[in-house]
A protein has these predicted regions:
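Positively charged n-region of N-terminal signal peptides that target proteins for export
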Residues: 1-4
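Mature, soluble, non-transmembrane domains
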Residues: 98-217
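Sec/Tat signal peptide C-region and signal peptidase I cleavage site
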Residues: 16-22
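N-terminal Sec/ER secretory leader and immediately downstream segment
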Residues: 22-99
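Bacterial N-terminal signal peptides
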Residues: 6-16
Length: 220
């Protein structure tokens, strides 16, 4: 009888431990060079013209990926696509990954894996991987849309949408969903969204656009 109890306890440990090691959650932000909170008429007019560039960032509050703890660390993906992001692409997107400079070698590899898992094909063609200090702060403003990101040559600063002041056509909604998987986020205004690096041979600087998302991510 004692033998069967021991086996049962061993089996219970085996099935519980991986579940605890696999969870990861944190904060998420993205900004694009087109409005994501917009009306269909404006979105249709911008398709294939704007929205080909974006900055995405994940900051881990707690958890592990591939059995590597990532608490407090962040990773950023800077994306340049051939077509408006959120639409079918005619060619592969290019990306630059910026990894938290505090990460160890194992954590660096796990953070790169996190970005690739969450962004999928958007980071399928990585042209550069850089280490940098990453500052990612989400403030406690009324509607939760205020955040700031600085990572190398990439910067995002957002504010909450004002349902009255920020309307143009009157039937705005979150026309384009977030680019990352496993996120809960709300649209926000990008006060500033810029990338001044050299990896793409192109830079961008955008401001006061309804083109951001601020929220959280969770992988179970």
């Amino acid at each position: 009888m004692y033998r069967w109890l021991s086996l049962a306890l061993l089996f219970a440990v085996v099935i519980v431990v991986p579940a605890q090691a696999g969870g990861i959650s944190g904060q998420y932000i993205e900004a694009r060079t087109c409005d994501v909170w917009t009306g269909p008429c404006f979105a249709n007019a911008d398709m294939s013209l704007d929205g080909k560039h974006a900055v995405l960032a994940w900051k881990v509050d707690q958890g592990a990926l591939d059995n590597v703890r990532l608490d407090g660390l962040a990773v950023v993906a800077i994306v340049s696509a051939s077509d408006t992001l959120g639409l079918e692409q005619t060619g592969p997107a290019k990306s630059v990954l910026i990894v938290d400079s505090r990460a160890s070698a194992a954590q660096r590899a796990a953070l790169i894996g996190l970005a690739k898992r969450q962004a999928g094909d958007l980071v399928g063609k990585v042209v550069a991987i850089q280490n940098s200090k990453i500052e990612f702060e989400a403030s406690t403003c009324t509607d939760g849309g205020c955040a700031r990101l600085e990572a190398g040559k990439a910067r995002i600063e957002t504010r909450c949408l004002d349902g009255h002041h920020d309307k143009v056509c009157g039937n705005e909604s979150a026309f384009y969903p977030p680019l990352s998987k496993d996120v809960k986020a709300q649209a926000a205004v990008a006060i500033e969204h810029s990338f001044a690096g050299t990896a793409f041979n192109e830079t961008w600087k955008d401001s006061q656009r309804r083109g951001a998302y601020v929220g959280s991510f969770e992988i179970r």
